[in-house]
Amino acid sequence: MAKRKYGRSYSLDDTDSCSNKVLIVPTGQSSSNAITDFSVRKAHACDRCRLKKIKCDGLKPNCSNCAKIDFPCKTSDKLSRRGLPKGYTELLEKEVVRLTNMNASSSANANSNLPFINDTFYCFDNYNTQSENQRFLGHLTWNILTNTFPTQKAVVFTDDRNNIDLQLQLLTNFLNLNGDFNHLPNFLLLKYDYNLQFLKNLLSVIIKDFFKRQNSLLLLLYPTNLWKNLLLDKINSTAMTGEPITLLALLYIIQFTWSCFDDFKLFKVTKLIVSLTTNSKLDLKVLQLVNLSIFYFMGASVDSCKSKSSLTEHSNVNSVIWTNDLLNLNFTNILNMGLYINPKNLIPISGNNNNNKSNEEDDRIVTFWCFQFLSSWWSLIQGLPKSNFLTEEFQPKSISVLEIPRLKPFEILLNFIIYSLDGCNLLNISSLNVSDPNFQFFQNELESFKKNLLLWNLYHNLSDHDNFRFLTSSSNKKLTTNLLLKNLTGLNHKLNQPDFVEIQLTLFYLSLKLMTLKEGDQDLKKEDISLEILSLYFLILTDDSNNDDNQQLQPQQLNLYHFTPFNSIDIIDLCLNNLNNWSLSLKYESGQNQPHSSKIKFEKFQNFLNHWCPIWYYDEFSTNPFLQILKINFKLLPFETIHYSQEEQRLLISLNKLRYLDAVSSFNSSSVKSNFASKVNTQLNLLQHSSSNSNFLDASPYDFNKIFMNNFENYDYETDEGYAEDDDEEDSDSDNSLPLEIPFKKSKNKCKNRNKELSQRLSLFENRDSNSVDFNTDTNLNLNPDSPSVTSSKKKYLDHIILDNRDIVSNHDSSKQKFKIQNILNSTF
């Protein structure tokens, strides 16, 4: 039996022209002449026929049954089986009418009331101050209406020269800088034995490396040539004072390279220096400096790579808080400077338009869009409500109007993040189904971004590098520890600036693709995208472009932390977990006949992890639990059995991530406790380090421990604390219970090379200024000119180290000697 249908599919006001059946009976007092056909079932019976449960003919206005007794024939919905409640439709119609009237009245009120200022913004003149970097003043409505319009003479710019000394003092105290050496970090001075000329050359290298890496895609410091010259002039300057903004930018570049500052102190001192900068000529530089700090803190903290503790477990949360704070600070700077307004529409209060600042206008546009990208990107990946509506309300100049070819990659990224995904809730997108239109729109925009990268040849692959074919090509040759070591030591590739731009753009696409990928996607799998992401990070991890001449900066693993404006370590951990989960799912299917493709994929993943893990987990072979899981699931090689020769150790010298960070942490904590670290560091005798500078490039594999070694060798002992002294009575002591003493041999040519070494050290800071430091060649004087001179007769340097039953090592075996020294340091500190 067919299912009964309710309702009608035709109008009661029409007649069926193709049938003789009458659907509507003419109205009248009597229906005796009406032609009825009871063979047609009516859709709705009247109320009386329903109650009586009799057949209703549905005639209008009265059915036959109601007409017989003159009963008012009515049809309502109150007795309908599947109908809506009585009056529901009428109620909806009334609500629609009410809302329509309300909308019309609100529109009328809006048109009749005061206009919104953003809509009439360009109808009147907008003023700014006439300075190198302009300050936005608005319409100056009050001044115009009160006839007190200011003139150029009324504008007085604050001279912040008095604040410079305070800013430099804050930087010195917060970040442990050495005020006598051009405010360089004491960490670097001790690390490189006060070899100032070498340190100057090294800083020049890392400045160029910064503009090649972090500043390649996002132009944080723009124009690059201007900033390069400012930074190079800063490290070559002989003046004791300088511009704090440039100095702080240099310190951020140092932090990118050595990670030697505490992040909390760096954040606090950044806000202090910016707040104390009152010179309006530095507005644009301040804005770019804060953009640089935002980029840095978006990359999280290096403390997250240490073992979890009460101090490090909240490091990533702190980075989020600090980034939000700095974004709000720069948003205020944007409003004050009026960067969202076309400069041609701004009128200086002096009445003279300055048309000779086209270059400055370009710098303002690039800086504005750099901030807009950072703000939109951070809102996307952190789920922050959108509060920056400058681009929608005022539509400032696009970066494409500059027509600068090197800005094209940045323009492509801007169009994707700001114009396609601005205000998007990434968490909401990832929770949608594949068939949802919003999810499909997001994926279409993501694929359009990839197509643009491919169109402009900006999509980077591991296959672009010939020396990495052993990671991608399938070989029947079984991988052994010797072959693995040969492959790793042969990775001497150098990435250039276009490579870094392409890698960053590709990582933006792959990271978003990985986080929003669904399990049911047949085209892409999470493990495949994870491997592609890890391969790009492997290129950066093994990049050797900044390790020429064995300069030994920070461990190579730390170079991944602040390469992009997101936490790269979280992405790496996610990718490794995806590979591990895939291997577990493959084990569950081991009882079935596995396809040949799964076996090939397993071998590809296994080959890559065999090359990734020895570098990424170099100093965690036995302590990292996740590495042990990977070794079991992918049957990785026993990395602990790899034997490195002395030359191979030199190639893998900068992989001791944990030891390096512990040394930095110990140095920073000791400087805080002592509260006079800068004084101690400046009292080190220049001539005491002459022998170590000559063979600096032959440093220990753990060269960061020279921070402690310098203090250890030159510590001033005023009293006898139980150590062996070099007097005749103790030398003649025949007590066998005394510990073994091995004196350090002093260099015989120290005095001969004294003048040469001194001139080399002072070449960075020649005495060209009356306020500069006056270095004295007297050996009894210290580096610090303000400290009292101490005669060498009162100095007792520690020339002996007590060895507790350690083997005596000859001087010709340098590697063993360094290892023994390392043991001494470990047992001492």
From Swiss-Prot:
Alphabetized InterPro entries for the sequence: Yeast_MetPath_Reg, Zn2-C6_fun-type_DNA-bd_sf, Zn2Cys6_DnaBD
GO-annotated cellular components: nucleus
Molecular function in Gene Ontology: DNA-binding transcription activator activity, RNA polymerase II-specific; DNA-binding transcription factor activity, RNA polymerase II-specific; RNA polymerase II cis-regulatory region sequence-specific DNA binding; sequence-specific DNA binding; zinc ion binding
Domain of life: Eukaryota
Assigned keywords, A-Z: DNA-binding, Metal-binding, Nucleus, Transcription, Transcription regulation, Zinc
Biased composition (Acidic residues): 722-734
Any one GO biological process: positive regulation of gluconeogenesis
Primary location group: nucleus
Compartments (UniProt record): Nucleus
Regions recorded as binding DNA: 46-73
Region: Disordered, residue numbers: 722-741
Function: Interacts with the SNF1 protein kinase.
Xref: PANTHER family: PROTEIN SIP4, ZN(II)2CYS6 TRANSCRIPTION FACTOR (EUROFUNG)-RELATED
Name of the protein: Protein SIP4
Originating species: Saccharomyces cerevisiae (strain ATCC 204508 / S288c)
Gene of this entry: SIP4
